[in-house]
Amino acid sequence: TLLILNRQFYRNTDTVSVLDVGQGQCITAFAGDATVMIDCGNTYNLSDAGDLAAAYLHSCGRDRIDLLVLTHLHEDHADGVPRLMEMYDIETLILPEERGDTLYEEILDSAARHATEVITAKGDMTVTCGDIGMELYAYLNGGENERCLMSRLSIGSYDVLVTADAPEKLEKRFVNEHDTDGIETLIVGHHGSKYSSGDELLGAVDGSLAVISVGYNNYGQPAQETLERLAAYGYNVLRTDEDGTIEIRIGQDNG
């Protein structure tokens, strides 16, 4: 009975969650009846991120995904999408174009089979999904990790910044081009890589919580210097490899 009550309470609570998908990323946002997901990738070969994401949504009483945004087409951010589409209706998918990429083509084929609307990001976009707002910042040129969609997700007055795998060079562009006031939570870029979450970004974003989506890896992530930078700027750091799935429940005042 307590579990049912907790689920009912959970279902009616605006929430941003960073799922424990190992060395990958999958973020969900619930507000009212709206369900948004950013990325769905990895867990290595132990399981599929799509299975894990579907199970999580089901446990929260969510029966559809209104919007799925893919920051880029690396497997650790997107390889769970085909499986997820087999289990959940996804109304709209927004992603950057990566013609010739095998996973990109597989996702488009799956979207066509399941009647998911596909929007290819050609530039910055503003998206509203019920009580969830999103600003998508399209960086579509440059090196491999420089081609991505960064996003600012808003529920009421609560804002979270998702920087994908953006390196410091791209973070500097973002800071110079966009307002960073009011961002409370940072989803740390590139699983805590030493090449992301630089001083310019951390100095511009006056947030209090940093979440690192990371699992066992051979890349030294999260890097010690990144953890030290976050601490120096006063961030409380949570990480999925130590804390599991991280749920941020937003108060009734949406802040």
Predicted regions and their residues:
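Non-globular, low-confidence helical/coil segments that flank catalytic cores
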Residues: 1-255
